Amino acid sequence: DFNSLVKSKHYKWDSEDKCWYRNLTEQTGTYSDRAAEIGHELLRNGFCICIHDPDITEKAINGDYKKEISKWVKWNEKTQSLALYWLVKDESYDASRKIVGNRYNFDTQCVDIHISHYRAVNNFAKKYNFQFSEAAIVAIEQYKEEKRNMRKVKVKDV
């Protein structure tokens, strides 16, 4: 039914405004792609739709939109760690719990991993098709720069 379909695409009902909505972020993709996606799914399931933008309408009809990326490596500023995020958990969750230093964050419902383990996170991300957020990329580059600039010393015996 209609409600199940829009809920499966992560839309929520606003009882005050009497409409379905979805907050969009860097991770969800563009408005036009998400509008085309929900339009396409509604059409495929026999619902009539009305989209006022002709380009988005064509994308909805043809299914020609960028698929939503549902697995992300984000940067958690509060914990200063890389955060593995799933829109829907899958087999990669168990694998993430094997990365050294992982910790489940109950507040964010993500798996946090200290940035010093960025190589393991990168390997994991490649294997399980996770995308890095811009903030995570910046944090990793900053960490690598700090490591390069660390002064190595040899302590004399006294």
Name each model-derived stretch:
Residues D1-V158:
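Accessory DNA-engaging acidic/polar modules
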